[in-house]
């Protein structure tokens, strides 16, 4: 059992999970972890499934150099976002592990919230790529360590119901012109 960066305030109402030296990009995983922090467990699992299906994006706030813009990032108040599938799958595995730990400990799975999630850099793995004129360049990978714990909350906020589709001014004018013809 490894040491966690910090311990939960109420250890009896918490469950942990961690992964070490995971072969998944550190920067993508860091942004994905930041997106699910403080989310209820059920919402976090649904969100990560939506990321793999490209229905919701992960907002890139810190490691956003060269990241393209996407419309789905507007719901997070930013413009840049991506769909890091491998990071989402690794985090989904860890959440499922923590959920089974909670079930084993006798916690209420429906009231769990992602209280703490942290991604650290692991030791880089070194390979080489061969270039023109006999040169060799490094071909590095950036694995990471992930740790998280879920805490049983007093009450989990229900997902806000999405309001009906709003019609824009352009759509209203199209309907008005169609009605006159």
Swiss-Prot record:
It comes from the Eukaryota. The keyword Ribosomal protein applies. Keywords: Ribonucleoprotein, Ribosomal protein. One of its GO terms (biological process) is cytoplasmic translation. Residues 157-181 are annotated as: Disordered. Belongs to the universal ribosomal protein uL22 family. This is Large ribosomal subunit protein uL22. The lineage of its organism: Eukaryota, Metazoa, Ecdysozoa, Arthropoda, Hexapoda. The gene is RpL17.
């Amino acid at each position: 059992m490894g040491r966690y960066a910090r311990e939960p305030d109420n250890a009896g109402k918490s469950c942990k999970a961690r992964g070490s030296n995971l072969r998944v990009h550190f920067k993508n995983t860091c942004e994905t972890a930041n997106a699910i922090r403080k989310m209820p467990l059920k919402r976090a699992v649904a969100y990560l499934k939506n990321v793999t299906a490209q229905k919701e994006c992960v907002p890139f706030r810190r490691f956003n150099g060269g990241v393209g813009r996407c419309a789905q990032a507007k719901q997070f108040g930013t413009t840049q976002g991506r769909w890091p599938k491998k990071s989402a799958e690794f985090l989904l595995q860890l959440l499922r592990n923590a959920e089974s730990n909670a079930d084993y400990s006798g916690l209420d799975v429906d009231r769990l919230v992602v209280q703490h999630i942290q991604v650290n850099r692991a030791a880089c793995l070194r390979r080489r790529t061969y270039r023109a004129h006999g040169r060799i360049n490094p071909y590095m990978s950036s694995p990471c360590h992930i740790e998280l714990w879920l805490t049983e909350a007093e009450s989990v906020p229900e997902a806000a119901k999405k309001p009906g589709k709003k019609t824009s001014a352009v759509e209203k004018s199209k309907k008005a012109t169609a009605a006159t013809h």
